């Protein structure tokens, strides 16, 4: 009613050609902006200029809102600069515009200049809850979390200004802390809030889910159910379904689904995708597919959820069949496909799918690159790794820790250790993941001295190792054979690092002792293990025994391996070769006959070359290729040339065939 009166006053003033107060003009500009009448607003602003009306904060805020909605920030800033004495109204109008357009650094700059200005001493010019919420939104949306000092400054301002009791500010603080992986600070803010709403609960539950704290996510959901003031909504259960799917907790997820139905939560597309993703990840693929088939509306996330589920359970053909049905393929679906193929060791298809993705016009992101790089590593494609590295630098993806560590792994495993070190040196995020990657790189090359040096540097800089880091360090000693140093680190795991040795660490120690020629010590070490040895432990002993030619210990290890992994052809091959080297031909033949009875065949050697049409693989003794006759003729010619020039002995050539 009041707004209508103000508009009437402003219009009357226009008819009388008289200057009216700024408040009336402000309401009129707000009305025209809301109804998308930009020409009317421009005419009003022109009239304001003609009559030399100095816009107050209310009128200025409406003009700023109009111009920023039109993406005319220069005019908005001009209006802002004309304000004689600014207050929260005008500052907030510009802050809201900056954050809504994701102009986060402009928002930071404006806020810092505001709290440092002379007008800040006035109560009317102090930031309010809207101002703080805008800055927190900007902090949450910005990937450069080195802005931590500004975040601490804002948090301090919140406490000093008494804004910590404001629910919107509290929610903003939770969102910021969860997005920069500081879940402990987020929980502290949540616990200290005197008033909470559904958004508070959802922000905390989502934070736990996204940070991988799945049990805490489920506990927070149960606490929300126990709170009579709030009920979970669609946003809540999406986060919980994601946590249940990632932790393969089918039972808890079923309870969530049941509660969702009881509370009549509306099933929109996002929630349907979350439900399908949960069932697919937990292995209930038939039910997930039934829900998928019933959906009238699907998007790329829907397809990606089913494809990821198929891939996670090794159903590659089913995933590819569904993928081929899609008419429009989004980036998330491409990523699900490429990631799934990589996890199932279909590395040739990964590289070819990536090429097809580029051909179709999809632009790869960090998820794509971190899935592609392991396949390039497997295919010994260092050139491809360098090309992806260059692409990552050009597109700013080299700041992503998973892309960075995949590049380090690619370079290290393909012999470019200097390149791996350079990538690490340029890494802005020296997190534990990055340290572990470079330590592993030196471990692969058997450089235990460099691995240990990096391990010490990491600790001096305040980064504590985890179980994966310690596995990398121990594996370095396995390559170098320094059993004393390995034993020292292994013995200090619990006392110094508070990490209980796992089966991977025991396997590394067996490998260290075996490669150092201490097979008896390795046998004794296994006998004293507090956990049952897995195939990896016996495999380490077998490899050590095969190197030293200890037939009895090798046979002892193989007997266990035949029980644990009867279809692993590598174990049979090693044992048969050991018997052959010892001249025990009958036993070697018995092992080979056992393979035949089970239906096992030695996995043939494979090599690759990259052509313009993609990656081409070649299998040893394969004659199925239509040009195999031509290829073998070329090989025979090369062999004859090598033999004539005495590059290799004739006997070695015969054995090669």
From Swiss-Prot:
* Recorded GO MF terms: RNA binding
Q: According to the UniProt record, where is the region Type E motif? A: 537-612
The domain of life is Eukaryota
Entry-linked Pfam families: E_motif (PF20431), PPR (PF01535), PPR_2 (PF13041)
- Annotated region Type E(+) motif: the residues are 613-643
Q: PPR repeats located where?
A: 21-55, 56-86, 87-121, 128-165, 166-196, 197-232, 233-267, 268-298, 299-333, 334-364, 365-399, 400-430, 431-465, 466-501, 502-536
Kindly indicate whether the keyword DNA repair belongs to this entry: no
Keyword terms of this UniProt record: Repeat
State the Gene Ontology BP annotations.
RNA modification
Family recorded in the similarity comment: Belongs to the PPR family. PCMP-E subfamily.
- Please state what the protein is called: Pentatricopeptide repeat-containing protein At2g37310
Q: What is the lineage of its organism?
A: Eukaryota, Viridiplantae, Streptophyta, Embryophyta, Tracheophyta
């Amino acid at each position: 009613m009041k707004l209508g009166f103000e508009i009437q006053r402003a219009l009357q003033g226009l008819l009388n050609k008289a200057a009216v107060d700024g408040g009336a003009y402000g309401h009129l500009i707000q009305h025209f902006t809301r109804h998308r009448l930009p020409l009317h607003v421009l005419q009003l602003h022109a009239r304001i200029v003609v009559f030399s009306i100095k816009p107050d904060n209310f009128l200025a805020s409406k003009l700023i809102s109009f111009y920023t909605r039109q993406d005319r920030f220069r005019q908005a800033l001009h209006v802002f600069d004309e304000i004689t004495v600014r207050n929260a109204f005008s500052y907030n109008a510009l802050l809201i515009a900056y954050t809504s357009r994701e102009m986060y650094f402009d928002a930071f700059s404006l806020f810092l200049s505001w709290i440092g200005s002379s007008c800040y001493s006035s109560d009317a010019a102090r930031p309010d809850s809207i101002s703080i919420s805008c800055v927190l939104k900007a902090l949450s949306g910005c990937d450069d979390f080195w802005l931590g000092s500004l975040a601490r400054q804002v948090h301090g301002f919140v406490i000093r200004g008494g804004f910590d009791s404001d629910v919107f500010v509290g929610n903003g603080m939770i969102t910021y802390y969860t997005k920069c992986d500081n879940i402990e600070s987020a929980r502290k803010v949540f616990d200290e809030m005197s008033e909470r709403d559904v958004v508070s609960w959802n922000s905390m539950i989502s934070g736990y889910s996204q940070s991988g704290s799945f049990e805490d996510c489920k506990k927070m959901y149960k606490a929300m159910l126990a709170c009579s003031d709030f009920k979970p909504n669609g946003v809540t259960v999406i986060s919980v379904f994601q946590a249940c799917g990632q932790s393969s907790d089918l039972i808890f997820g079923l309870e969530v689904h049941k509660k969702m139905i009881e509370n009549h939560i509306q099933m929109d597309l996002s929630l349907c995708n979350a439900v399908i993703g949960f069932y697919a990840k937990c292995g209930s693929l038939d039910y997930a597919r039934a829900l998928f088939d019933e959906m009238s509306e699907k998007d790329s996330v829907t397809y990606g959820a089913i494809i990821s589920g198929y891939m996670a359970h090794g159903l590659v053909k089913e995933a590819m069949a569904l993928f081929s049905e899609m008419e429009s393929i989004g980036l998330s679906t491409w990523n699900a496909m490429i990631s799934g193929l990589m996890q199932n060791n279909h590395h040739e298809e990964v590289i070819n799918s990536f090429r097809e993705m580029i051909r179709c016009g999809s632009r790869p992101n960090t998820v794509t690159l971190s899935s592609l790089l392991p396949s390039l590593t497997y295919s010994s494609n260092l050139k491809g790794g360098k090309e992806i590295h260059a692409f990552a630098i050009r597109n700013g993806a080299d700041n992503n820790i998973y892309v960075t560590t995949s590049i380090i792994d690619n370079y290290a495993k393909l012999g470019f250790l200097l390149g791996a070190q350079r990538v690490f040196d340029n890494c802005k995020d020296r997190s534990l993941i990055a340290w572990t990657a470079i330590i592993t790189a030196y471990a692969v090359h058997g450089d235990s001295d460099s691995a240990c040096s990096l391990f010490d540097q990491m600790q001096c800089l305040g980064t504590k190792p985890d179980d994966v880091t310690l596995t990398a360090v121990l594996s370095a000693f396995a390559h170098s054979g320094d059993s004393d140093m390995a034993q020292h680190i292994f013995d200090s795991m619990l006392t110094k690092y508070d990490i209980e040795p796992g089966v991977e660490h025991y396997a590394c120690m067996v490998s260290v002792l075996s490669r150092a020629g201490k097979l008896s010590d390795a046998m004794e070490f296994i006998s004293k293990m507090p956990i049952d040895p897995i195939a990896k432990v016996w495999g380490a002993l077998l490899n050590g025994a095969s190197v030293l030619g200890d037939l009895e210990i090798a046979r002892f290890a193989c007997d266990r391996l035949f029980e644990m992994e009867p279809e692993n052809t590598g174990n049979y091959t090693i044992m048969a070769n050991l018997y052959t080297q010892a001249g025990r031909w009958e036993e070697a033949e018995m092992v080979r006959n056992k393979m035949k009875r089970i239906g096992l065949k030695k996995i043939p050697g494979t090599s690759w070359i990259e052509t313009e049409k993609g990656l081409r693989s070649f299998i040893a003794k394969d004659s199925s290729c239509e040009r195999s006759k031509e290829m073998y003729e070329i090989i025979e010619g090369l062999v004859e040339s090598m033999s004539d020039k005495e590059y290799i002995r004739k006997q070695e050539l015969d054995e090669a065939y």
